[in-house]
């Protein structure tokens, strides 16, 4: 009997170990944060501001009093109240009539749709400014190229001036070339004159022959 007792003991301890392992899971599931049962801070602020009858808006001190009267712990959630006011102002549900940031007076916005529409319109209007600034820079670069094109005709004018100078020099050469032609004509005239002299010489012998014939007749 003493040998069988140690064998039965481990079988009993195994279910206890499984139960101990399951308990931490339940504890971990119970450690999840619970959702707040009451309304959020922003909802409480909007209700308090809408309930106020002040024309200039509800101040921060009056808002805290209204929230404390509703059972909200203002001292612990002071930072949450300020953040809630800022978010409501940025969304357009509340309008800040006085002060800056969380301090000041706040009033319920009667036309929240208009403020959202204005905010959306302002954002697209700011975007076209960037391309408009780039266009003048591109336009300023283009005139530089045009100026470079204007400079190139000046270079073209210089060859034209050189051509006119060459054309002016060429008539001088033509006149020089023309002078030898006159000298070439003068020898022709000289050649034409020489035969006349030859004719005169030929005429003189004829006259001499005639004189000789006359003497013979006598």
Swiss-Prot record:
Keywords: Acetylation, Chromosome, DNA-binding, Nucleus. GO terms for molecular function: double-stranded DNA binding; nucleosomal DNA binding; structural constituent of chromatin. The keyword Nucleus applies. Belongs to the histone H1/H5 family. Residues 37-110 form the H15 domain. GO terms for cellular component: nucleosome; nucleus. InterPro entries: H1/H5, Histone_H1/H5_H15, WH-like_DNA-bd_sf, WH_DNA-bd_sf. This is Histone H1. Histones H1 are necessary for the condensation of nucleosome chains into higher-order structures.
């Amino acid at each position: 009997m003493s040998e069988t007792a140690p064998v039965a003991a481990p079988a009993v301890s195994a279910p206890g170990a499984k139960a101990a392992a399951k308990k931490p899971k339940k504890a971990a599931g119970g450690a999840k944060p619970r959702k707040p049962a009451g309304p959020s801070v922003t909802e409480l602020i909007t209700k308090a501001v809408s309930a106020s009858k002040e024309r200039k808006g509800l101040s921060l001190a009056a808002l805290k009093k209204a929230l404390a009267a509703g059972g909200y712990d203002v001292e612990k959630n002071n930072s949450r109240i300020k953040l809630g006011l800022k978010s409501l102002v940025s969304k357009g549900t509340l309008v800040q009539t006085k002060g800056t940031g969380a301090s000041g007076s706040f009033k319920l916005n009667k036309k929240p749709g208009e403020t959202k529409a204005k905010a959306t319109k302002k954002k697209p209007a700011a975007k076209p400014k960037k391309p408009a600034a780039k266009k003048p820079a591109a336009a300023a670069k283009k005139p530089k190229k045009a100026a470079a094109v204007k400079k190139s005709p000046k270079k073209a004018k210089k060859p034209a001036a050189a051509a006119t100078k060459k054309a002016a020099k060429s008539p001088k050469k033509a006149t020089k070339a023309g002078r030898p032609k006159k000298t070439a004509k003068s020898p022709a005239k000289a050649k034409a004159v020489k035969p006349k002299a030859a004719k005169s010489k030929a005429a003189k012998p004829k006259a001499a022959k005639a004189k000789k014939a006359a003497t013979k007749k006598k």
